[in-house]
Amino acid sequence: MDKGEGLRLAATLRQWTRLYGGCHLLLGAVVCSLLAACSSSPPGGVKVVDRNGSAPAAARRTPVTSGQYIVRRGDTLYSIAFRFGWDWKALAARNGIAPPYTIQVGQAIQFGGRASTQPSVAKNTPVVAAPVATKPTPVPPAVSTSVPAKPAPAPASTTTPPSSGATPVVAGPAVGGWAWPASGTLIGRFASNGSLNKGIDIAGQLGQPVLAASGGTVVYAGSGLRGYGELVIIKHNETYVSAYGHNRRLLVREGQQVKVGQSIAEMGSTGTDRVKLHFEIRRQGKPVDPLQYLPRR
């Protein structure tokens, strides 16, 4: 209410007390509170909003913090951390897994309780091996370290038309350590609510190069994570990893060192309904908006 309404209400309350008596002290306190509230309210109903941190940089996805996961064939510590929303270092500490962070089929990865000092292995627990993608032949050095001289052509007119909000993107030189992982049309953006898209989607042509967005080590190459198809995960440092999903064919293997701009896969549609690259950047296990890191287009 405004100050005028507060004064009118105070007059009404005083008249009521003269008629019915009693409760003077209580009503006086109420009147003072109302007047103080009115005088401190911003004019025009303006709402004061703290802009600091109002736009979340990462999807608010809470990591799994209870239960356990039994390691299957093809799993790595990094792929398990990626799947369940953990920072790989924290998950390693929780389970007492020391560098080089090797895990075994049948090992129980704990998400709850206290950090362990010894890795635990499930006993008498049947383990169903997950399908394992055939490991691709490593790219010869002359090819693996090269960067395409010019971007791949835009999607042909016969492909599915992009949405009205689609934005053309072109792979190019790295800026601030990051480069676009593919050329094509930006058809999906990062979102921390609703559909919860934890990265961006780039539509392109079947078989076109998918490039490492920054240098690092391949820590996962396979198809064991539901919803990602043929997936590559690259560890860049102790803080950041990047992921490249829905590929037709993988050109790198786990443990391989890659450089920014190196071809790591061929774009495809595995695990989805159209040819596209799903690209994510994760900071300490949390998805962040790749557009805040990639060069502006």
From Swiss-Prot:
Residues 134-168 are annotated as: Disordered. CDD domains: LysM, M23_peptidase. It is found in: Cell inner membrane. GO terms for molecular function: metalloendopeptidase activity. GO terms for cellular component: cell division site; cell outer membrane; plasma membrane. Residues 67-111 form the LysM domain. It is a lipid-anchor. Keywords: Cell inner membrane, Cell membrane, Lipoprotein, Membrane, Palmitate, Signal. A lipid is attached at C23 (N-palmitoyl cysteine). Residues 1-22 form the signal peptide. A lipid is attached at C23 (S-diacylglycerol cysteine). It comes from the Bacteria. The keyword Membrane applies. PANTHER family: MUREIN HYDROLASE ACTIVATOR NLPD, PEPTIDASE-RELATED. Belongs to the E.coli NlpD/Haemophilus LppB family. This is Lipoprotein NlpD/LppB homolog. The lineage of its organism: Bacteria, Pseudomonadati, Pseudomonadota, Gammaproteobacteria, Pseudomonadales.
